[in-house]
């Protein structure tokens, strides 16, 4: 997961 799961500054949208 990415931004929609972690904090919002990991991979992007929801990767």
Curated annotation (Swiss-Prot):
Coiled coil: none annotated. GO terms for biological process: neuropeptide signaling pathway. PROSITE patterns: PYROKININ. GO terms for cellular component: extracellular region. Keywords: Amidation, Neuropeptide, Secreted. GO terms for molecular function: neuropeptide hormone activity. InterPro entries: Pyrokinin_CS (IPR001484). Its main location: secreted. The modification Leucine amide is found at residue 15. It comes from the Eukaryota. It is found in: Secreted. Belongs to the pyrokinin family. Myoactive. This is CAPA-Pyrokinin. It comes from Striatophasma naukluftense (Gladiator).
